[in-house]
C-alpha cells in the first residue's frame, strides 16, 4: 500500500473543502494510505482520525511571527519523514511548503499553482510571484487547475512541460438543491481589484429592478467603490465573515450567480454555484470559459462589456420557471460531473500513479 500526505496550511475554506473531500474519498480506497496535514482550526467539516494532523501554523502564505516557529516546523518535518510517504501533495502556497519539500526524502512532491500570473492590484502579488518561483524550483510536479495557462506557466517560470500537470478543480457535492425563484442575484467572494466590483457597480445601476446580494470581505483598495454600492437601493451588502452555513444560504437563496471579473485564473465561485444548482453569468476572462457550458450551465459575456452583461442578466431573469428549472438542474449535473470529489478521486490517483512511474 502506498502512502500519500495531503497538505494545506491555508485558512481559505475552498482549499480546505477541496483537500478534506479528497482525503475522505481516498480513505475508502485500499491501494492508498492517505494522511492529511492542515491548520489547527479549519473552517469546514473534517472527519478527524489518527491520520489527520492539525497544527498551529501560520495561516497565510506570507511571512508572520508563526513562520519562525522552527521547533514546530521541524517536528512536523520529522513526523513526515518518519512515515516515509510515497507522495506529498500541496493544495495551496505556503512558506512552510518549501522546507517540507526540501526535506521530503524520496517522496514525490506535487504543488498546485492557482495563479500563474498574479492578479494586478492584489496586495499579495509580489509574494505570490515569489512563492510560485520557489515552488517551481523545488517541487517535482506543478499542478494547474486549468489548461489555458499551461504554456504561460512554462514560459514565465522556465519549467519543462513534463513537470506540468493539469487537474480539474473539485469540491464535495451535496444533493440537488431546488430553485427558490426569488429574483435575487448573488456576487460572492472577497472583494479584490480583479473581482470587477467596478463592473458590478455599473451593472447594478443598469438593472434597477433586479435585487443583488453582495457578500464578501472588502480589500482596502476597494472601499470607495463598495461605499457607492452600499448606497444603491437594489443592493444588500454583507462584508462580514460568513460561515459555511451562511455561504450555503447565500447560494441557495439566489437565482443567478454573477462573475463580472476583470481577470481570473479560474473561479471557485462558479464551482460553488453549480454545487448549489445555480447557473452563472460571467465575463469571458482567463480560464473561466473552460468552466461554463455556454447557454446551458450559464452565459459568457465579452470581457468588460457591462452593458451587454446587464442585458444578458435581464434576459436570464426573465425566463419562466420551467425553463429556469431546466437550466438549474443542468448546471448541477454539469458541475457534478466536472467537479464532484467522488469523480475527481480517480483522476487524482492517476496523477499520483503516473508521477510514481517517472
Outline where the language-model segments fall.
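Acidic donor-binding loop of glycosyltransferase active sites
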Residues: 250-266, 278
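Active-site proximal beta-strand in glycosyltransferases
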Residues: 87, 102-120
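Nucleotide-activated donor-binding/catalytic signature segment of Leloir-type glycosyltransferases, i.e.
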Residues: 224-248
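Short His-centered aromatic/hydrophobic patch
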Residues: 90-96, 113
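Conserved acidic donor-binding segment of nucleotide-sugar-dependent glycosyltransferases
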Residues: 294-295, 299-307, 315-321
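A short, well-ordered alpha-helix in the C-terminal region of glycosyltransferases
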Residues: 322-338
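A conserved mid-protein helix/loop that constitutes part of the nucleotide-sugar donor-binding site
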Residues: 16-21, 192-206, 271
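Donor nucleotide-sugar binding/catalytic pocket of nucleotide-sugar-dependent glycosyltransferases
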Residues: 137-175
